[in-house]
Amino acid sequence: MSAARRPGSVLVLARSGRMRDGHLAVVSRVVSSREIRVDHANWASGSLKGRIMRDQPVLDVSPRNDWSVVKVWYPPSGAYGVTAYPAAGFVHPRSQWAAR
């Protein structure tokens, strides 16, 4: 895993109190050193649960700007959520396939 974020990489949120299985989101774009946008599902509740949310903001709130703690946009409130989530890092797709 890496702290480097780029479009196509997968943000991995670690298991925590209310999020017993963790969460994955695909980076759609990098906005700044502290903000990315992601595509993900099952973040909201109620009628939005299960829907794929596209280009949703995620904010790095870690003290060292290392993407170890993030806040995620919560569509029903139209704002970042109150909870800060531990992030395990980013998984990057392979850019090349090994020759056979």
Task: Give residue spans per PLM region.
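...with weaker cross-activation on analogous glycine-rich loops/strands in unrelated enzymes
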Residues: 1-45
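Aromatic- and glycine-rich peptidoglycan recognition patches
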Residues: 32-100
